A protein has these predicted regions:
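Short beta-strand-to-loop acidic/aromatic patch adjacent to the donor-nucleotide binding site
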Residues: 82-93
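A recurrent flexible, glycine/aromatic-enriched loop bordering the glycosyltransferase active site
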Residues: 70, 121-122, 136-156
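C-terminal catalytic/acceptor-binding lobe
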Residues: 167-283
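N-proximal low-complexity "stem/linker" segments adjacent to membrane-targeting elements
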Residues: 1-21
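A conserved acidic beta->alpha catalytic loop
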Residues: 36-47
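Conserved donor NDP-sugar-binding/catalytic core segment of glycosyltransferases
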Residues: 97-129
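Glycine-rich, basic loop-to-helix element that forms the pyrophosphate-binding segment
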Residues: 63-80
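Short, acidic, metal-binding catalytic loop of nucleotide-sugar glycosyltransferases
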Residues: 21-30
Length: 283
């Protein structure tokens, strides 16, 4: 059963040189890597072109305009023929065999929807939260369940796209995963964890973010969206993000429809009470 993997590049030539080579080298002859380049950074383009002859480099698309994530993702989903669809970010180094493990789990467990690799650190794992949501399926595959997972190092059944369609312009991958969960698909991180090295985590041995100035120069999109403009703030966000993923409500209806609207209204009107309720709702 074949796998198609999206790899998006932008303006990080040093990261791309490491991450694209690693991704290509982790693939076998049943896997195809589709590279989409956003923008006109020539150094990054040169790095991408240097890998064009690799046997696992399947397709390349260059968008002069930065189309970010949704359009490249839909490009893969519309055109790729594989049984499984994945994505790896240019700031992530994948471990050997990662896609094979996830594919085997998908084949053995029909209800798995989006499953993936973990990129947080040991210090980010809170056993009293995580252990409650690690579930074994078919006697052999374990998953740390959540309604959504991150957008790098995942593998998704093609049937998910048949069920849900493409990413809509006003919705992100997190929302897509939640809606899949609402349809009965099971999402989460394979356990024991398959670790991908997130180089934009300042704790990574391969990070390019060693000072606050490095962070400002190469500000990750998530850091920008969360107002994390110093290494201290960025590390604090990453740790809290891992906590959220281990404690978030497992009922997808909590995030959708009328219940979600009521919850957002309640949080806006009664912020202190809402924070207390959130703590009590942790699973």
């Amino acid at each position: 059963m074949s796998i198609d993997i999206l790899f998006i590049t932008y303006n990080r030539p040093d990261y791309t040189k490491l991450s694209l080579k690693r991704l290509l080298d982790t693939c076998d002859d049943t896997m195809r890597v589709w590279v989409w380049h956003n923008g006109t950074d020539q150094k990054t383009l040169d790095v991408v072109q240097s890998f064009r002859d690799h046997p696992n480099f399947f397709e390349f698309y260059h968008s002069i305009e930065n189309k970010k994530l949704n359009e490249p993702t839909n490009w893969l989903w519309k055109n790729a023929p594989g049984d499984f669809l994945g994505k790896v970010d240019d700031d992530c180094l994948m471990p050997s065999g990662w896609a094979n493990v996830l594919r085997e789990a998908h084949v053995d467990v029909p209800q798995f929807g989006v499953i993936g690799c973990w990129h947080y650190f040991e210090e980010d794992i809170i056993p009293e939260y995580a252990n409650k949501r690690i579930v074994r399926y078919n006697g052999q595959h374990q998953l740390l369940q959540n309604c959504w997972i991150g957008g790098s190092g995942y593998l998704m059944k093609r049937q998910c796209v048949k069920d849900m369609g493409l990413l809509q312009a006003n919705r992100n991958f997190t929302n897509y995963c939640i809606r899949l969960a609402a349809k009965g698909w099971v999402n989460g991180w394979y356990y024991p964890f398959i670790y991908q090295d997130h180089m934009d985590d300042p704790r990574s041995p391969n990070t390019g973010l060693k000072t606050d100035e490095d962070l400002k120069k190469h500000l990750p999109l998530t850091a920008k969206n969360t107002g994390s403009y110093s290494l201290t703030d960025w590390l604090d966000f990453l740790h809290k993000d891992a906590l959220v993923l281990q404690s978030a409500n497992l009922d997808p209806k909590y995030y959708l429809g009328l219940r979600a609207k009521i919850r957002k209204f309640r949080e806006r009107i009664f912020p202190l009470k809402s924070s207390i309720i959130k703590e009590s709702e942790k699973i």
